[in-house]
Amino acid sequence: MRKMLAAVSRVLSGVAQKPASRVLVASRHFANDATFEIKKCDLHRLEEGPPVTTVLTREDGLKYYRMMQTVRRMELKADQLYKQKIIRGFCHLCDGQEACCVGLEAGINPTDHLITAYRAHGFTFTRGLSVREILAELTGRRGGCAKGKGGSMHMYAKNFYGGNGIVGAQVPLGAGIALACKYNGKDEVCLTLYGDGAANQGQIFEAYNMAALWKLPCIFICENNRYGMGTSVERAAASTDYYKRGDFIPGLRVDGMDILCVREATKFAAAYCRSGKGPILMELQTYRYHGHSMSDPGVSYRTREEIQEVRSKSDPIMLLKDRMVNSNLASVEELKEIDVEVRKEIEDAAQFATADPEPPLEELGYHIYCNDPPFEVRGANQWIKFKSIS
């Protein structure tokens, strides 16, 4: 009898030590998956497009929610650090566009490739880098993903080729990466992203032509957030049907605020490229909450009411949250716990990013050359000992 009472006491004391919300979540039975209807994509030169229904598992839903919430909180922390003058220089935030970076990653393989423009923080995270490495790069510290030398626009990870500062210049590079995939006989694709502001660049159309001519496994992706700096798409383009811009290249127009739409469209586009049919073009209709960059308040060319309307009706995190709660894939309490954990992760990363030392002056020339080639090959001044170390 005493042993039984002791065992019961241990069980009850263990429950008492846990927060009530955790006990409630642990005892609740959730659905393993749910089927959702998603918006049909507009098609160009395609007879069939991505499915209009999709299955979301509880595991994937929780993962997507955590990732989008992490990107959102990371960008808000970057905004705070910039206003405190801890982050300097160019800084472009992507809050509001989380469904794009998380949804694209959900539709490809880790071995696939991705290159984008300067609004790159979210993609850097979804490609596998930690919040610590990203925030430390923003603050110019040694622990940053580019050793503190790249900043906001020049971050890199495995199979992620940046952050590129020149408008539209990454698109021919993306076609080149796709060429390498085909040349090496690899079943890989390259996601090549650019914004609506870059969509009128001539080099993009040249890349279209070469990719179609050589049937490269390249997914050209226009992130249409409706404004190129402060210019609306209607004032910048004679045709705002960016998914048709490839002309001879098939295209999709996708709801870029819905992570499930983005995921299914990406899977469809990747399968198209892997089949050897050549490139395909995706237009993601999305929206950024911040201005173009930190120097742009974002309300001189659009109203606060417009921004608030998008937040209230189309926010990608809220859309996923509502779906999961209403389909018994998760509870409000469980998602709140994730929010708390994400905030703590961001705060810890921010402390690291402000306490980590800056790179010393003697390391200014490090990481320029690969495999430490001799001076006569690199053509450098003999008295400047540039080094290449990893």
Curated annotation (Swiss-Prot):
Residues given in the record as Mg(2+) binding sites: 196, 225, 227
Protein name in UniProt: Pyruvate dehydrogenase E1 component subunit alpha, somatic form, mitochondrial
Residue positions, PTM Phosphoserine: 232, 293, 295, 300
Activity: how regulated: Pyruvate dehydrogenase activity is inhibited by phosphorylation of PDHA1; it is reactivated by dephosphorylation.
NCBIfam families listed in its UniProt record: PDH_E1_alph_y
Pfam assignment, any one: E1_dh
Keyword Cell cycle tagged: no
Taxonomic source organism: Bos taurus
GO biological process: glucose metabolic process; pyruvate decarboxylation to acetyl-CoA; tricarboxylic acid cycle
Swiss-Prot/TrEMBL cofactor(s): thiamine diphosphate; Mg(2+)
Entry GO MF terms: metal ion binding; pyruvate dehydrogenase (acetyl-transferring) activity; pyruvate dehydrogenase (NAD+) activity
InterPro entries: DH_E1, PDH_E1_Alpha_Subunit, Pyrv_DH_E1_asu_subgrp-y, THDP-binding
Positions bound to pyruvate: 92, 118-119, 157, 165, 167, 196-198, 225, 227
